[in-house]
Amino acid sequence: MQIDCTLAKVATRRVGADAGERSDDFLICAIAKGDKLSMKVLFARHNVRVYRFALRLTRDESLAEDVVSEVFLHAWRGAKNFQAKSKVSTWLLAIAHNKAKDALQRRRHEYLSDDEAAAIEDPADNPEAIFSKKERGTLLQECLTKLPAAQREVIDLVYYHHKSIEEVAQIVGAQASTVKTRMFYARTRLARTSLYRNP
C-alpha cells in the first residue's frame, strides 16, 4: 500500500505552507513529484540520525558519510515506490542498514576506534551533559563493542533510535521473535558486566 498523496495535493495549494512543518509522509509525496525543497527538509530532519546509525554499524566516519549520501539518493529515486507499511524514519534506517552492510562488505578492514565513537557529540548538549554523556558513553561503548554485531545493531535501534521491535524487524529484515531473542541475549551479556546499569 503506497501513501495516499491526495491530501498532499490539497496541502500544496495552501498559501504560505512551510515545507518544514509538513509530515514526512507529505514530504515523500512531494519528493516523488520531484520537489527538491521537500528533499532538503527530509534530509535536514533525518541526516544526523541516519549518520549516527551508519557510524555505529560501520565504525568509519567516511564510510558513514557515504552511506548517508546513498540513503538519501535512494530516497530521492525511490520516493514514488515508498510503501506506507512503516514510518519514513524506519524506511530510511532500513535503507541505511542495507547500504551499510554493502559498504562493510566492500571495506571490511577499516573500523572506527572506540575513542572516536565516544567523541561524537550532539551539538545541542551543554558542557555538563557532554561530560556526563562522554563518561557514560565510554563505559557503554566498551560493553557494546563486546556484543556480536547483530545484537549490537538491535540495541542501537531500540535504545538510540527508539524503534519498536516490529520496526527493528523491518529494518534488519528479521522476524520480531528473532529481534526479541537478540535483545534478550544482548541484555544478558550487558548485565554480566559491572558497567551495565538500567536507567
Residue ranges and their predicted role:
Residues 1-29, 33, 41, 45, ...:
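Intrinsic, short, N-terminal disordered tails of RNA polymerase sigma-factor systems
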Residues 27, 43-44, 51, 61-78:
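Conserved RNAP core-binding helix
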Residues 32-33, 59, 70-87, 106-107, ...:
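Sigma70-family region 2
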Residues 52, 66-73, 86-98:
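Structural recognition of an alpha-helix C-terminal capping motif at a helix-to-coil junction
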Residues 63, 178, 185:
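Residues in the helix-turn-helix
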Residues 68, 183, 190, 194:
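DNA major-groove recognition helix of helix-turn-helix
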Residues 80-84, 94-114, 133, 185:
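Arg/Lys-rich amphipathic alpha helix in sigma70-family domain 2
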Residues 154-158:
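A short pre-motif secondary-structure segment
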